[in-house]
């Protein structure tokens, strides 16, 4: 089994074999993390600055080139300490990293 985070969007017929972070979009026959559900966040009434912070955190964690994934997650915890939604994503990721399924990462 895997977990699907809050407000995540999974494309129809997408195979998901890892945990999907909150606010993510996954598409493809073999599901791949494509980005954030920005439109869904805006439609849900989240402030533009909150959506922007989530996007910056996503880019830092999943698209960053420095360090390894786990180190970027730890650094993001400090960089985005004032944003509860980013902290929710980081909690989800850290829980997944301890589990058997792991978290889906962007390619």
What are these regions (language model features)?
Residues 1-32:
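Structural signal for interior beta-strand "rungs" in well-ordered beta-sheet cores
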Residues 29-107:
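Terminal amphipathic alpha-helical/low-complexity segments used for targeting or macromolecular assembly
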């Amino acid at each position: 089994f895997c977990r699907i985070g809050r407000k995540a969007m999974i494309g129809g017929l997408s195979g998901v074999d890892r945990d999907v972070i909150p606010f993510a979009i996954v598409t493809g026959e073999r599901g791949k993390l494509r980005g954030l559900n920005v439109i869904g966040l805006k439609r849900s009434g989240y402030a533009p600055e909150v959506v922007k912070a989530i996007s910056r955190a996503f880019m830092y964690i999943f698209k960053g080139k420095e360090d390894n994934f786990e180190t970027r997650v730890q650094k993001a915890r400090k960089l985005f300490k004032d944003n509860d939604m980013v902290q929710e994503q980081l909690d989800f990721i850290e829980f997944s990293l301890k589990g058997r399924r792991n978290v889906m990462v962007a390619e």
